[in-house]
Regions:
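Hydrophobic alpha-helical connector segments
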Residues: 73, 80-113, 125
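N-terminal intrinsically disordered/low-complexity leader segments
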Residues: 1-23, 194-197
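Hydrophobic/aromatic-rich alpha-helical bundle segments in the mid-to-C-terminal region
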Residues: 122-125, 134-197
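Mature extracytoplasmic domains of secretory-pathway proteins
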Residues: 114-117, 124-133
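Helix-turn-helix
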Residues: 21-27, 31-69, 73
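Alpha-helical DNA-contacting segments of helix-turn-helix folds
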Residues: 64, 70-78, 82-85, 118-121
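Amphipathic alpha-helical interaction segments
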Residues: 27, 102-106, 146-153
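Short alpha-helical functional segments enriched in proximate histidine and acidic residues
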Residues: 35, 81, 131-135
């Protein structure tokens, strides 16, 4: 029985001399993201990351305190990448973005590994609620927050379990179409619930 081949990574670079902290952090974060996209998370180790970029092993603890600190910075970088690509507040394709999916899975994994979930709370709802309210014609903060909470739970669930369920692409498209239609009814729902005060 032959073993499956591991994904090929670029060859490790020779060990660099001393580099400025900001440069080291950038190298480590970018290398971690590249590796997390193609390897099982438990194979993305401090040794593997530092070897890939040619830095010494203590560079991670010197710059981030620990691997958890590095991974926390990775989640922030992934979030910023996603928001930069999907700056239109009503763009629902964010849920299919590879960095969004990676961030969601990484946060879930780190939480299961015992990390404090609160450190990964990026106040996404608080940050986008005002823009979302304006885009939809002035919904109340209560309605906006309730809607965004449901949407975030759905897209995070999709990021974690889409491969388990193996839904056809048409089913996902239909779901997004239905959500778009429901979103257009939020003002009526808000009025019916009395949340427009």
């Amino acid at each position: 029985m032959t073993r499956p081949k591991k994904p090929a990574l670029p060859k490790a670079k020779k060990v660099r001399g001393v580099v400025p902290s900001a440069e080291a952090q950038k190298l480590l974060i970018n290398a971690a993201i590249e590796m997390l996209h193609i390897l099982p998370f438990d194979q993305v180790t401090a040794r593997a990351i530092t070897k890939k970029v040619g830095l010494s092993l203590p560079t991670i603890s010197n710059n981030f305190g620990s691997m958890a600190g590095l991974f926390n910075e990775v989640t922030i970088k992934l979030r910023n990448n996603v928001l930069a690509r999907h700056h239109k507040i009503l763009d629902q394709s964010i849920s299919l973005d590879p960095d969004f999916i990676l961030r969601t899975r990484l946060v879930a994994w780190l939480t299961l590994e015992g990390e404090n979930p609160g450190q990964f709370n990026n106040q996404l709802i608080e940050n986008i609620a005002p823009q979302f309210q304006t885009a939809l014609g002035g919904l109340s903060l209560r309605t906006t927050t309730a809607w965004l909470t449901l949407i975030i739970f759905m897209v995070e669930g999709h990021a974690l379990f889409s491969e388990v369920h193996e839904y056809p692409a048409t089913q996902i498209t239909d779901g997004i179409t239905l959500l778009t239609q429901l979103r257009q009814q939020l003002q009526n729902s808000e009025n019916a619930l009395g949340w427009n005060n």
